[in-house]
Amino acid sequence: MQRRSFLKTSSVAALAASASVAGAQIVPPFKRQPRIAIGGIASECSSYSRIRARLENFSVLRGNDILTDERFTFLQRYDVPFLPTLVANAGSGGPIARDAYDALKTEYLGRLRALLPLDGVYLAMHGAMYVEGMTDAEGDWYEATRKVVGPDCILSASYDLHGNISQRIVDNLDAITAYRTAPHVDRVENTMRATDMLTHCLRYGIRPGIVWATIPVGLAGEQSSTEW
């Protein structure tokens, strides 16, 4: 595959702004039908909360229930099927109990292995997950995914604007997008940007990459709205 860096930026929000997608142009058919999995885990955690998110606090979609969920029905517009694994969401709350995270991760990886070999994986994430005893839960999820699918599989994820980035994440992901609005009215569009990049790269034989540079800037929540 041709190696090309799609994303050179300093924040997840800017990553989203620089995302390159296929758009509405007429595109050629795939040279061969790629195998693309979909999975993920999302939670917006406050590390100060004493209330732990347990397994029963997660809404978990498995198998074909993912494809029929309203958040992912747009996947039907692609000329390639997406292979479902597990998508878990705990919404906003306290830290995630380690045993809950480990259980979901183990099930996800088992479902992922059953689909091998894979050309791509789309990961529906949030970016602000905090798990007991871990400093980079998203990085752990991506690294575990990479170990299963191998170095040639393209991993693309979608994030919230304030999602956390680490070197571990950059080393294991190939593409990332984030909301461009706050409040978030572009949820579906954000997911589509991630899957558009993934399918575009597989169609044209492009291997995307992420370049990460930090900047010393912080914004309060009330200063980050795009609506006023």
Write out the residue ranges for each language-model feature:
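Active-site histidine-anchored catalytic micro-motif
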Residues: R98-A100, K105, L115-R203
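Hard-cation-handling environments
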Residues: Q223-W228
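Short catalytic helix/loop segments, enriched in acidic residues and glycine
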Residues: A53-L75
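C-terminal segment of N-terminal export signals and the immediately downstream linker at the start
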Residues: S20-I38
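N-terminal export signals
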Residues: S5-A24
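Short polar catalytic/cofactor-binding loops
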Residues: G40-S49
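Flexible, glycine/charged-enriched surface loops at secondary-structure junctions
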Residues: G205-T214
